[in-house]
Amino acid sequence: MRRSAVSPPWGATLADRQSPIRGLRWVAAATLVASAAVAHAQPAVIFELGGKFDRSFNQAAYQGAERWKKETGKPYLEFEVQNAAQREQAARRFAERGASPVVGIGFPQASSIEAVARDFPNQRFAIIDMVVALPNVQSFVFREHEGSFLVGMMAALASKSGKVGFVGGMDIPLVRKFLCGYEQGAKHANPKVQVIASMTGTTPAAWTDPARGAELTKAQMAQGVDVVFAAAGTTGLGIMQAAKDAGKLSIGVDSNQNHLHPGSVLTSMVKRTDLAVYEAFKGVKPGITALGLKEGGLDVAMDEHNAKLVSPAMLKVVEAAKADIISGKLKVVDYTVANACR
């Protein structure tokens, strides 16, 4: 039995055309060029459950691929996973077609990227939110606790009840990492604030259950929560809708989700999976690439949709904390390193 090159999670979420090969449905982001040489030069991206238009994690990755396409004028290949079995099938089929790099979006794809990268050592691969320790793989990981700290501060400063909420997707170390950073930030801004947290579930289905997200949000609001952080993939759409319906505030994640409910979304903790995909498409650099506030891999979203919700005083405090985290003056505990939030 070979030794796995996949490290534990640092973090970790449509329609395509029918193919006779293994029943998979394939979509090319642009018309495929007949020349084999050109086809072999094409990069490929495999989106995780929820699809490239999930308005969250996958969609940010899609935007990175589209940015590369627009800048280079070149096409890329894509596939949207519908079930677990398709992850390795998609990666292997792309590799067989000569695609390079093949980029897996999300930690659930790590084992498939590892297996296929071993079998195609002369091609390049990339994985987001996991470490695959192979010489032809670039692993992108994020310091999500840093960005979560900032939105935690904003939640505490915006709260009138002194109670802020967190609804996570799948209960895994990655989501606990978000929660831990959020709680630290909230208590940094207001030591007396109460943080009420819920997890949607323990299986990947927790990322795509807006109805359950809405239920958990309503339960928190019944306890007095008036700001809730939705760190739950597509499930977050239900969380944010429930907050809006109750006249409360929500915080988006991964993509800038402020526009989904203008005047109700306090901010979004933007995680630049778009940057990771864009950089991988430009050229894989094997090894680990860590992205945080300093590298521009994370940030809070400010735009016309939430400008009236964030006072100049609040923004000033948050920007000061951001600068202190970047300089190292302010340390934020990483749950996945400490295995605790303390």
Region spans (language model):
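Bacterial N-terminal signal peptides that target proteins for export
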Residues: 4-30
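A residue-level marker of the well-folded mature domains of exported/periplasmic proteins
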Residues: 40-342
